[in-house]
C-alpha cells in the first residue's frame, strides 16, 4: 500500500511540475494585461477566435486565454485566481480531474478552461449536482463571461423546448447532470429536427465529479410511458411475505443485499397461491412480485433507503441523504414498497428511452471534472472514463487536526459520548458540523440534543430546500449543525468572528460511511483556506459498516484490549486501519458492481447508438426517404419469399406466401393466387418488388408533392421504429433480470446476455422492416399530411 501511495505522490509531483511550466506562461501576461483598458482586454476574445479560425489549437492560445479570463475575473468579480487555480484550470482543459480541497475556489478555477474552450463556438457544458448551484454559478460567473463577450445559458427543468434550445445554443451552458441526460433522450424521441434542443456534445466540466460519475454512475435516466396494471398481485405478494420467518423461510446475504426463499418458503408459496411448481414458466409474473415483496419488506429500510411523505414513497439518495423527488425504483420494487407501507400503489411504467450517466458522459468529445475527493477512485476514473486524477496543491497549508477514530461497544454508548463532546464544545462556543449516515441517526441525535437543551439545526432529506442557508451559517459561533451524508456540497462554510481562536470548525462523524470518499468530504468541510479545525469520528460495533464487514476482526481486537464495560472506549490507529480496510472491501465490491453494470450497459449502448443514428438520418432527410423505405420493403419481400420457397418447387408453400402478400401488401381482389404460379424464386421477389414500386408511385401521385411524401415516409418509419425500440428495451430489461440465473448452468451470464441481446436486436430490425412494409403498403392516403 505504501508503494502505491508513493507512486501516486510522485506521479502527481511530476505532473504538477509540468503544469507549473504552463502556468508560468500564463503568469507572464499578468502585468501586461493589468495595464490594458477594459476595451482592450475585451478585444482579446475576437482576436483569439480569429487565431483559432486561422488554424491555431486551443493549447497554442491557452496562455493568453487563461490570462484574459484571469484579469477579467479580477475586474468583474473582484477575484484573482491563484497560481494553484491556474494549474487546476489546465488539468480541466486537458480532460482530467482536478482534485482540489474544499474552499480552494473550484468555481473560479473552472472559469479559465471554460472561457478557453468556449472560444471554439462548439459549446461548453458546466455540470452541477442541483439547480441551486447551476443558477448561482450561471448568475455569478455569467457576469464575467458576458463581460468578455461570450453568451451564457442556464438550462432548468422548468424551461420549455424553445428556452432550452436557446440555452444550449449559448457558448457556455450551466445545467444539472440529470437535465442534460433527459434532454438527450428527449431529443432522440422527436419527430422533427426543429424540436431538438441540444447541439453535439462537445466539452463538459463536471463539478462534484465523483458524486455524478461514481455515486450516481449506475442510476439510469428513464423516460417512460404507462403500462398494464398489476396492483392486486403486489398486495397479495406483500401479504404473503409478511407471514414468512427469517432464516426458516428466506435467507438474506447482507454484503450483496440479496434475498431468496428457502425450500420451506417455496413450499409455503405454492400452498398459499395454490400452485404445483412456483418456478413453472407461467408463474414468472408471480415469482417476480414475490421477489420484489421480499426485497421491499426485509432489505429496503424505511428512513434509510426510502421515506414516506404525504402518502408517497420517496427514494433517499444514499450519498447525499436527500429525497430524490420524481425518482422511482424500477422493475416493480417501488410498487412493492408502496404495498408494504400501505400507501396507494402507482401504476408501473414502460421504459421508452434510457441511459446511465456512465454512458451519457462518455459521449462527450472531451470530459473534465473537479471535486475535493477523487484520489481513492482514480483507478475507476482512468479505466472507465479515461481521465487522470491530479491532486492540485492547496494555496495555504492545511492545519486541521484529524484525530484517530474512537470505538464503543454499543450504539447507545457511542451517541452518549457524541452528545458529551458536543456539550463541552458548545459551552466554549465552538461551531460544530455533525455528520450522520442516515436520516434515522440524525433524528436520534437531534432528540438527544433536545433533551440536553442544546440548540441545533438538522439538515436531511426532509428539509433540503433550506440547505445552502443552513450550511452557510454552520461556521458561526455556537452553531451546531447535523447533516446527513454531506448534504450541502458546493456551499462554503466560512468561519464567523472569533471562531478561529476557538479552534475553528469541529467536524464530528457519528459513523464511517462505506465509502472513504464521503468521510473525506465530511472532514474537508473543516480547515478550508488554511483555517484551523478538527475532525473526530465516533464508531460502534453496532454500526452498519461494522455489521456488514469486518466486525469479527475488530471484536477479536477488543478482546485483546479487554473491553468489558459498555461505555468503555478505545482510541487506536489500529482500529482506524481496520475500518479503512473494511471500507476498501466495500469500495472494491461497489467498483466491481459498477464495472459489471457497465459491461451489460455497453450492449445496450451499441444498440442505442445504431437506432438513434438511424433516427437522426430519417429526421435530417430533406428530400426523400425512398431509398431507405424501399430497402426495408425489399429486405422483407426477399426474406418472406425465401422462407416459403425452400427445397424443391413441389415443396414450396405458395398458399402461405399468397396469404402474407394479401395481408401485408395488397387487397385480395387486386391480386390472384394464380399470379404466383410457375415462377422462380427470383421472379417472385421481382414481382412483389414491382408491386411495391407501383404502390410507391401511386401514393406519391395521390399526395401530389415531394414534401408531403417525405412527411408520410417519416411518420411511417418513426412510428414503427419507436414502438419496436420501446418493446426491445423492455425485453432487454427482462433478459437482464433472468440472465443471472443462467450463471448456475456453468455459463458466463455476460456472454449469454451479449449473444442473446444481439439475436434479439437482429430480430427487432427484421420486425421493423416487416411492420414498415405493412404500414406503408396498406396505408390509405388522406390529403394533406403537412404539419
UniProtKB/Swiss-Prot annotation:
Superkingdom of origin: Bacteria
Pfam families registered for this protein in UniProt: P-loop_SecA, SecA_DEAD, SecA_PP_bind, SecA_SW
Any one Gene Ontology cellular component term annotated for this protein: cytosol
Bilayer topology: Peripheral membrane protein
Annotated localization: Cell membrane; Cytoplasm
InterPro entries cross-referenced by the UniProt entry: Helicase_ATP-bd, Helicase_C-like, P-loop_NTPase, SecA, SecA_CS, SecA_DEAD, SecA_motor_DEAD, SecA_preprotein_X-link_dom
HAMAP family cross-referenced by the UniProt entry: SecA
Protein name: Protein translocase subunit SecA
Organism, as annotated: Lacticaseibacillus paracasei (strain ATCC 334 / BCRC 17002 / CCUG 31169 / CIP 107868 / KCTC 3260 / NRRL B-441)
